[in-house]
Amino acid sequence: MRLSRFFLPILKENPKEAEIVSHRLMLRAGMLRQEAAGIYAWLPLGHRVLKKIEQIVREEQNRAGAIELLMPTLQLADLWRESGRYDAYGPEMLRIADRHKRELLYGPTNEEMITEIFRAYIKSYKSLPLNLYHIQWKFRDEQRPRFGVMRGREFLMKDAYSFDVDEAGARKSYNKMFVAYLRTFARMGLKAIPMRAETGPIGGDLSHEFIVLAETGESGVYIDRDVLNLPVPDENVDYDGDLTPIIKQWTSVYAATEDVHEPARYESEVPEANRLNTRGIEVGQIFYFGTKYSDSMKANVTGPDGTDAPIHGGSYGVGVSRLLGAIIEACHDDNGIIWPEAVAPFRVTILNLKQGDAATDAACDQLYRELSAKGVDVLYDDTDQRAGAKFATADLIGIPWQIHVGPRGLAEGKVELKRRSDGSRENLALADVVARLT
């Protein structure tokens, strides 16, 4: 993509309304525009990152055996009355009526609808286990939306829902999602720590939040530093095998949010040198809620003994849009964003340091063609901005690799390659650049 043809509305000054780093940098980098309190338009740069995060989430859900569908944003109020949550959910749920006076709501979550879909089609234990997921926009009418995408009113979520004939099967499904989440966040360059959590309005008796450590996080957390060094399963993990050892490895090391923190246990189990009391950002949460929804909504299957029994369920959420904020909070410096390569809007940016110079233009065009032909996402800054402004923009938007092309270097057949993550630079022969990056 040539920057001269791209829509990138960079802001030179820090927006006054931005309270935290991620919100400030997303606005300055032209990724978002606020349309109302907690509601944003996703501009092209932000949308590219959003789609890359979404694809990683999708790939890991598929790898773990979940099946994608898509449910509507609007739901019938009667479904929520059936489960008993319509009145319990509170003012965060946006309730509306259509022209026929039918009561609807803008879904904050989908346990009721997925249970209704399940009970309409699944009648026998032979169709289980089953895990269905979707990636969809949601709305919660936060009283005080703030911090950009970290606490907005409209947000993109991945929600998965598992169905099993008994508790043992449901816990196996829970373990699959636990491992899938470890892999999902690691692929995005994040160290997300699973922590025992309260179940809240979802219900059930087992839940883990996945927390990314950040000083601006909304939750206080207490961890044993050993959890930071635990290995994440690789892509060859056997989801049909016994995942219990992985779960035990991650849950046997102390890690808790302030809501469920046990000070006495923390002090007795964790050596003082290993204690870390900091803050974190929740990027996902998983729940086992047993028969909570199948009991109230009569989602039963015929078991092996011929009798009907309610299914055991779980739900598993990832804040897809929220992850952009979490990644920026964890990956930035004074100059801007530092995107991990897997989620970067572009992998490489070419900076033409003397637009209009024949040799410089030709070298940049050659690099742009050759890298693009190799499947590399390239943003080519072919604008007439001065070099200093181009450097500042490249650092702000956080592209992992910068290629600086100017007459002085080309006189020696060289260009400069800069790595955004550590600022390291190397001079390469023009002919070697493509091989270095592919």
UniProtKB/Swiss-Prot annotation:
The keyword Metal-binding does not apply. Gene3D superfamilies: Anticodon-binding domain, Bira Bifunctional Protein, Domain 2. InterPro entries: aa-tRNA-synt_IIb, aa-tRNA-synth_II, aa-tRNA-synth_II/BPL/LPL, Anticodon-bd, Anticodon-bd_dom_sf, Pro-tRNA-ligase_IIa, Pro-tRNA-synth_IIa_bac-type, Pro-tRNA_synthetase. GO terms for molecular function: ATP binding; proline-tRNA ligase activity. GO terms for cellular component: cytosol. GO terms for biological process: prolyl-tRNA aminoacylation. SUPFAM superfamilies: Class II aaRS ABD-related (SSF52954), Class II aaRS and biotin synthetases (SSF55681). Keywords: Aminoacyl-tRNA synthetase, ATP-binding, Cytoplasm, Ligase, Nucleotide-binding, Protein biosynthesis. The keyword Aminoacyl-tRNA synthetase applies. PROSITE patterns: AA_TRNA_LIGASE_II. It catalyses: tRNA(Pro) + L-proline + ATP = L-prolyl-tRNA(Pro) + AMP + diphosphate. Homodimer. NCBIfam families: PRK12325.1, proS_fam_II. HAMAP family: Pro_tRNA_synth_type2. Belongs to the class-II aminoacyl-tRNA synthetase family. ProS type 2 subfamily. Catalyzes the attachment of proline to tRNA(Pro) in a two-step reaction: proline is first activated by ATP to form Pro-AMP and then transferred to the acceptor end of tRNA(Pro). This is Proline--tRNA ligase. It comes from Rhodopseudomonas palustris (strain TIE-1).
